[in-house]
Amino acid sequence: MPVVTMSGTIASGAREIGRAAASLLGTDYVDQQLLVDAARRLGVSLDVMAKHDERCFSFGERLSSMLRGFLERSAAGGDPLTGAGGLEVLLGRTYADMALEREEPEISDSVYMKTMTAIIRELGDRGDIVVLGRGSQMILRDLPGALHVLTLAPQELRIERLAAREGMLVEEATQRVHNSDKARGAFHRKFWKADVNDSSLYDITLETSRLSYEVGAELVAGAVRSNVGPG
């Protein structure tokens, strides 16, 4: 039951390598957008969900089911975060949103961390998952057998990649890379007092100016297989 966390600077390939590695390993892949989409799906009635055998659910449906269970447990425990709408808002928070210090934040730091930690730990405990970002390398750092991967690339290359991928001007891509790097670093310093690019937090560091995303995915999958044996 492999568990991989992917962390990386924007446009360094963490998302692409994570998805490709999940495909090679036959595991699920989850990132912020998939979590938000799953929370949005919680409006689907239980009757509709009950008509399906859980083994036939798509990963998105299973993720929604997991989040529904999380909300039910939170409500039973008197947790202040209740309802799919509140969860969707929380999961949609960016690094920049949570790194800011506000006197009266819409979502408190403690609620955010408690919720994200619980969700990511449950994903890790279930296994067969590649998780992108959200501090997953910190939350699952003590999970036996989990593989933590960092992707890096020179800023100039990341700007070039982002401009091409998003169809934006180089100046706009430059600002976005700068803002993303700053927010990602501030987020990890705020919640874990950690340098997000500290290589000691990771088992593998991939410098993607020197290798393709496909090779990076093969290296990640190979490392997982060497730890858990053939599937």
Language-model features, listed with the residues they occupy:
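Short, amphipathic alpha-helical "lid/cap" segments that border enzyme active or binding sites
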Residues: 117, 213-217, 221
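Glycine-rich phosphate-binding P-loop
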Residues: 5-19
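Pre-Walker A (Motif I) flank of P-loop NTPase domains
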Residues: 1-4, 127
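C-terminal helical "lid" subdomain and adjoining coupling/linker elements of P-loop NTPases
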Residues: 227-231
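Short beta-strand-centered segment that lines the nucleotide-binding/catalytic pocket of NTP-utilizing
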Residues: 28-39
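Small-molecule kinase domains that catalyze NTP-dependent phosphoryl transfer to phosphate-bearing small molecules
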Residues: 59-66, 79-80, 169-214
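ATP-dependent small-molecule kinase phosphotransfer cores
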Residues: 39-128
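Conserved phosphate-donor/acceptor-positioning beta-strand/loop module used by diverse small-molecule
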Residues: 142-179
